[in-house]
From Swiss-Prot:
InterPro entries: Disintegrin_CS, Disintegrin_dom, Disintegrin_dom_sf. One of its GO terms (cellular component) is extracellular region. The keyword Disulfide bond applies. This is Disintegrin gabonin-1. Residues 1-20 form the signal peptide. Expressed by the venom gland. The heterodimer bitisgabonin-1 is a potent inhibitor of the adhesion of the RGD-dependent integrin alpha-5/beta-1 (ITGA5/ITGB1) to immobilized fibronectin. It comes from the Eukaryota.
């Protein structure tokens, strides 16, 4: 209800900037932003007006905040470069945050063998 009221106020005050409409899509925490000829689905809870990182009107991180969610985002800020965001298994290398994105990029030093899944056959080993 609050989001609908905010959209109505924004459309009345800024009629040419109101190119998006916020819709509630069945689940309380799932929202979509509808642009002309384009629908963007947001992360669960991103449009919750209580979300500390998100401006409920623009659906972007608040001023001074870097991100809303992601493995390299905590408390609305990017994690420091070098922070482990995905631990390697066995001899596999870890993946690290870059400090400039909320995503966890694949470690460029990983070889082809690091891509094997744990479900692959284990020769001479017992997995428990």
């Amino acid at each position: 209800m609050i989001q609908v009221l905010l959209v109505i106020i924004c459309l009345a005050v800024f009629p040419y900037q109101g190119s998006s409409i916020i819709l509630e899509s069945g689940n309380v925490n799932d929202y979509e932003i509808v642009y002309p000829k384009k629908v963007t689905v947001l992360p669960t809870g991103a449009m919750n007006s209580a979300h500390p990182c998100c401006d409920p009107v623009t659906c972007k991180p608040k001023r001074g905040e870097h991100c809303i969610s992601g493995p390299c985002c905590r408390n609305c800020k990017f994690l420091n470069a070098g922070t482990i965001c995905k631990r390697g298994r066995g001899d596999s290398l870890h993946d690290y945050c870059t400090g400039v994105t909320p995503d966890c990029p694949r470690n460029p030093n990983k070889g082809e063998s690091d891509e094997l899944e744990w479900s692959a056959a284990a020769t001479g080993s017992v997995l428990m």
